[in-house]
């Protein structure tokens, strides 16, 4: 992340002068510093600014910059004193054993079983607690399993000093003076995920900025050059990048990120809050399953954590001198985001959908399309064929329930291999609901541990989910993700009793799917249910296409059990939903670029958009450059 600090001076001075002129003496400002995309105001009387929030709101409206209030280090109590003060302010039954302090931000995050109960039991206002402790507080739901969050917080705590300097460097890079005030020029270079699924990556270039949108792997590619994004053809150095922005946590979109840090990238990574722990889990699992063949190390993953700046949805954020980013929920998986990129002084606006589901589901309410301006839309096409029409969601659920019941009634086993982020949680919730209603034959539901780990992160960030699920996470005695009907296992050995197994898909070594296939292969009345998209080259795709002989450790196994595909539950949009989404933006669009789909599906969707909606449409291959403006 190289830059010339000499170009920053006048711009920085203007920003700081405007802030100082706007602040009353009572604010007790001690310093102003860049904090990544934010401007941080440090005060030894932070309660004044927190109480008089209109002062900051007015400055934000004037400067068009994100401003945050920080407590000066001199007024912060020690962590032990702070916890003692907190405990004295709440009822005795409230447990504060999962409180994580972040010295870099002067914030403490309290994870608690009942956040509403803590709020109601606190004696005194939040402002008073900030005054007493010198720390700002965030409350979050305590998950059933906290180890992923604990690992993240441990890394952040250990690198607090490093992050303080990193945030300053990023801020100087973002708020540097522009090279030119001439109208923006912008282009996209396709590095992966075009006319193919996985290794999503593209480079957005302006005369001021270089921003990498997504950074994925294709673990099922046959050719080495098809596994990684083609950054080698961009002609730029790794530290010429201003930022990396991730749409979501799946390895197909985030799996290459630690490799960048391994080879020297030291810039920021932007994503939604839940994406940070989810991608950390995904990348760690990738190493664990790689048998020593991973392209990066756990240390590289930690470095990525340190350089990640999570963003709230719907907040406009400067990520370079001429690009502003806004993330909105794409409703694909927890934390998945569409990116709205505002280039220059309104010269051009790009929306990249990432992967999107444009309908309601048990986990999400369908995504918004309310963008003020969007000239270029980059839209996925996983199900871009005209024939890719899903049944109604409730009908799909009933078909799943009927399929499962038909097998369980014969005292047999149902195996459901699904991605462990997204559909695994939805199917678990569906089964929990229908068992409670007495509409599924009584049987054990076995869930692999990694799926439960992911579900725990859903509990922490339940505000990203549907209103109903969010309410249940906070208010029910038992979270819907901790159902009493689910049993956690790791590569379980099956007995003779009926069972439903929800196991992860898309792991590099195809485990634990192979483990269960070997046990089920000769049970002719057992069943494999395929409910998600199957990657080309994967074992799931081979089975879906009718292959019944597979190699296990050099031994050929014949799959004799039933294989059934259930349409309509996948976490993508079907053809009609994609067309509907594009049509909602039709009056604003100048161009649509279609990506993330097998080539025939990409071509079909692009042709349909052009023919039916009369919008200029492109479906580039990898290694193409497209001028936007």
Task: Identify the residue ranges that each predicted region occupies.
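Active-site neighborhood of phospho(di)ester-bond hydrolases with catalytic His/Asp-centered motifs
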Residues: 212-216, 241-257, 269-272, 327-331, ...
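Active-site-proximal loop/helix segments of hydrolase catalytic cores
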Residues: 331-336, 342-374, 380-390, 512-516, ...
């Amino acid at each position: 992340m190289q830059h010339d600090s000499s170009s920053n001076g006048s711009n920085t001075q203007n920003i700081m002068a405007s802030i100082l002129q706007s602040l009353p003496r009572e604010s007790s400002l001690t310093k102003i510093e860049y904090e990544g995309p934010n401007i941080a105001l440090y005060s030894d009387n932070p309660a004044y600014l927190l109480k008089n929030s209109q002062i900051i709101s007015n400055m934000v409206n004037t400067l068009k910059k994100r401003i945050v209030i920080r407590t000066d280090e001199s007024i912060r109590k020690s962590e032990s004193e702070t916890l003692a003060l907190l405990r004295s302010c709440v009822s005795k039954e409230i447990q504060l054993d999962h409180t994580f302090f972040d010295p870099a931000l002067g914030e403490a995050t309290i994870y608690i079983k009942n956040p509403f109960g803590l709020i109601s039991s606190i004696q005194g206002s939040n402002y008073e607690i900030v005054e007493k402790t010198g720390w700002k507080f965030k409350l979050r739901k305590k998950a059933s399993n906290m180890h992923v969050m604990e690992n993240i917080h441990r890394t952040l705590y250990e690198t607090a000093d490093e992050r303080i300097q990193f945030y300053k460097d990023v801020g100087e890079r973002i708020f540097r003076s522009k090279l030119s005030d001439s109208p923006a020029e912008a282009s996209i270079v396709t590095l992966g995920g075009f006319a193919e699924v996985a290794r999503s990556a593209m480079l957005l270039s302006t005369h001021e900025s270089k921003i990498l949108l997504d950074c994925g792997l294709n673990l099922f590619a046959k050719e080495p050059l098809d596994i990684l994004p083609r950054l080698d053809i961009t002609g730029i150095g790794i530290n010429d990048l201003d930022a990396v922005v991730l749409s979501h946590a799946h390895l197909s979109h985030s799996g290459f990120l630690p490799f960048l840090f391994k080879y020297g990238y030291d810039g920021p990574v932007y994503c939604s809050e839940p994406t940070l722990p989810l991608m950390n889990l995904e990348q760690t699992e990738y190493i664990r399953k790689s048998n020593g063949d991973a392209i990066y190390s756990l240390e590289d993953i930690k470095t990525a954590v340190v350089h990640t700046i999570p963003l709230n949805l719907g907040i406009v954020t400067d990520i370079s001198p001429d690009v502003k980013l806004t993330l909105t929920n794409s409703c694909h998986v927890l934390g998945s985001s569409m990116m709205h990129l505002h280039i220059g002084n309104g010269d051009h606006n790009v929306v990249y959908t990432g992967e999107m589901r444009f309908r309601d589901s048990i986990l999400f309410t369908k995504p918004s399309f309310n963008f003020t301006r969007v000239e270029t839309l980059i839209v996925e096409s996983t199900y871009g064929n005209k024939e890719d029409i899903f049944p109604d969601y409730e009908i799909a659920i009933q078909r799943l329930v009927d399929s499962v019941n038909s097998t369980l009634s014969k005292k047999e086993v149902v195996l459901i291999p699904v991605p462990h982020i997204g559909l695994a949680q939805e199917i678990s919730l569906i089964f929990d609901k229908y068992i409670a209603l007495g509409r599924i034959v009584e049987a054990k539901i076995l869930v692999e541990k990694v799926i439960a780990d992911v579900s725990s992160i859903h509990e922490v960030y339940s505000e990203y989910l549907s209103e109903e699920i969010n309410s249940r996470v906070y208010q029910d005695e038992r979270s819907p993700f901790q159902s009493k009907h689910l049993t956690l296992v790791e590569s379980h050995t099956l007995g003779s009793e009926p069972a439903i197994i929800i196991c992860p898909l898309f792991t590099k070594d195809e485990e634990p799917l192979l483990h269960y296939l070997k046990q089920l292969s000769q049970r002719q009345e057992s069943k494999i249910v395929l409910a998600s998209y199957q990657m080309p080259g994967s074992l799931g795709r081979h089975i879906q296409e009718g292959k019944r002989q597979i190699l296990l450790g050099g031994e050929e196994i014949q799959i004799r059990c039933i294989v059934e595909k259930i349409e309509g539950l996948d976490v993508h949009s079907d053809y009609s939903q994609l067309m509907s989404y594009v049509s909602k933006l039709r009056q604003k669009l100048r161009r649509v670029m279609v990506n993330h789909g097998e080539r025939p599906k990409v071509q079909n969707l692009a042709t349909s958009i052009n023919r039916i909606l009369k919008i200029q449409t492109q479906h580039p291959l990898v290694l193409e450059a497209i001028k936007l403006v």
